[in-house]
């Protein structure tokens, strides 16, 4: 007789990982959570809204995971997973409510799975949403031993008449960029081609550790700004860089004019460029130091930047909007 364990699936290790995961998930629970982990589904009670709209998003971490495997550092990529999802739904003015994760592997190691979920828990705490469920799939022969994949799904909420969809953007509005923490979770297939030695020194740290800096979560500062200002459009700068993401906030035909010298370029991007990437390709791949963009009235720009600084963020007036063709113009 052949057992499930002999086929490559260790049920006992699965039980152990669930126990380790529960303690991390419980730290994220908010008032709307109605049940604990372990049921067939997570339940969440909607807060009191007049005309609520649920806003959802899903994403993964991509090949940044390979850096984590090679550095044997697993507790940060979970933050990336949450960030990629909640920053997306934030673009429409949605407050994150809850999150679910999916972890797949060839051979389950409970301690590694727990570290991954520790990162997810940390990301949920940063974005004030609850981790109410998830799935860990052990698939021997499908993934190589030691390899994991992680993806997530976020649900947020917004009042229907407060949804930000770019319809109020006007010619002459300005663009405020909020600093990123590094490449975030995009461009890593290219990075892995260029950076072979992850233990090489970069500004007093191993470059592998620098590249594992978690994606910045913008929920708290942006939600505070939404309470005070008329923010007309927002963009999460992910894969495709400036060119792909900034025009996504436009409902009409506008062009975003971005001044490359309006903010300091982080050294990690200068270093990557020095390894052989053309500048235009950099802006079409990476966030180039700006992880989130706000479109606002010019009169509000100075105060928004001041408020961002007071909240510990770095904000810059990086450009403006003009009539065009849903494009980006770098100057």
UniProtKB/Swiss-Prot annotation:
Keywords: ATP-binding, Cytoplasm, Ligase, Nucleotide-binding, Purine biosynthesis
Pfam families in the record: AIRS (PF00586), AIRS_C (PF02769)
Localization terms from the record: Cytoplasm
Tagged with keyword Calcium: no
Gene Ontology molecular function terms on file: ATP binding; phosphoribosylamine-glycine ligase activity; phosphoribosylformylglycinamidine cyclo-ligase activity
E.C. numbers: 6.3.3.1
This protein's GO CC annotations: cytosol
Enzyme superclass (EC): ligase
Name recorded for this polypeptide: Phosphoribosylformylglycinamidine cyclo-ligase
Organism from which the protein derives: Clostridium botulinum (strain Okra / Type B1)
UniProt lineage: Bacteria, Bacillati, Bacillota, Clostridia, Eubacteriales
Gene expressing this chain: purM
């Amino acid at each position: 007789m052949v057992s499930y364990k002999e086929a490559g699936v260790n049920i006992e290790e699965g039980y152990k990982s669930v126990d380790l995961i529960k303690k991390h998930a419980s730290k994220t629970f908010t008032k709307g959570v109605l049940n604990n982990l372990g049921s067939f589904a997570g339940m969440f009670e909607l807060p009191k809204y007049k005309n609520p709209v649920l806003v959802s998003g899903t994403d993964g971490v991509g090949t940044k995971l390979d850096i984590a495997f090679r550095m044997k550092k697993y507790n940060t990529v979970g933050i990336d997973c949450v960030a990629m999802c909640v920053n997306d739904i934030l673009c429409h003015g949605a407050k994150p409510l809850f999150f679910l994760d999916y972890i797949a592997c060839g051979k389950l190691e409970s301690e590694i799975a727990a570290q991954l979920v520790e990162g997810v828990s940390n990301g949920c705490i940063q974005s004030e949403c609850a981790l109410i469920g998830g799935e860990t799939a052990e698939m021997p022969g499908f993934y190589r031993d030691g390899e994991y994949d992680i993806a997530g799904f976020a649900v947020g909420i917004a009042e229907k008449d407060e949804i930000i969809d770019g319809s109020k953007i006007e010619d002459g509005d300005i663009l405020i960029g909020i600093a990123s923490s590094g490449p975030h979770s995009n461009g890593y297939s290219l990075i892995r081609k260029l950076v072979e030695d992850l233990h090489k020194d970069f500004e007093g740290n191993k470059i592998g550790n620098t590249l594992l800096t978690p994606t910045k979560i913008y929920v708290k500062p942006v939600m505070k700004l939404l309470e005070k200002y008329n923010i007309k459009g927002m963009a999460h700068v992910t894969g495709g860089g400036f060119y792909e993401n900034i025009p996504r906030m436009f409902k009409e035909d506008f062009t975003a004019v971005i001044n490359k010298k309006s903010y300091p370029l982080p050294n990690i991007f200068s270093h990557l460029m020095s390894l052989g990437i053309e500048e235009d390709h950099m802006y079409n791949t990476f966030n180039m130091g700006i992880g989130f963009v706000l479109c606002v009235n010019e009169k509000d720009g100075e105060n928004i930047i001041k408020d961002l600084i007071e909240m510990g963020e770095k904000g810059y007036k990086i450009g403006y909007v003009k009539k065009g063709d849903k494009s980006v113009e770098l100057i």
